[in-house]
């Protein structure tokens, strides 16, 4: 999936995974009781922050990575009919897989 958003510095654009709609035992979860997912796919990565010497700090994630991010990290954005999450590199907790 290609998007027309370019993150700045150490920001990362993530497409959130779908919220779970059914429990393991088969019960359906109503929309108002669904937990917000804390994982998704990286769609775009900024160039990284600069250190004290002005050099770029490399990013740990790349486009296509499946990531786990902080529960309250990031900003939800609605752009061209799609929902995205913009998170800082420090809010990424792990790369899945």
Curated annotation (Swiss-Prot):
Assembly: Heptamer of 7 subunits arranged in a ring. Interacts with the chaperonin GroEL.
Primary localization: cytoplasm
GO biological process: chaperone cofactor-dependent protein refolding
CDD domains according to UniProt: cpn10
UniProt keyword Chaperone, yes or no: yes
Keyword check for Chaperone: yes
Superkingdom as given in the UniProt entry: Bacteria
InterPro entries: Chaperonin_GroES (IPR020818), Chaperonin_GroES_sf (IPR037124), Chaprnonin_Cpn10_CS (IPR018369), GroES-like_sf (IPR011032)
Similarity section: Belongs to the GroES chaperonin family.
Organism of origin: Bifidobacterium longum (strain NCC 2705)
Gene3D superfamilies documented for this protein: GroES chaperonin (2.30.33.40)
Pfam families: Cpn10
Subcellular compartments: Cytoplasm
GO MF annotations, alphabetized: ATP binding; metal ion binding; protein folding chaperone; protein-folding chaperone binding; unfolded protein binding
Function summary: Together with the chaperonin GroEL, plays an essential role in assisting protein folding. The GroEL-GroES system forms a nano-cage that allows encapsulation of the non-native substrate proteins and provides a physical environment optimized to promote and accelerate protein folding. GroES binds to the apical surface of the GroEL ring, thereby capping the opening of the GroEL channel.
Keywords per UniProt: Chaperone, Cytoplasm
CC per GO annotation: cytoplasm
Protein name: Co-chaperonin GroES
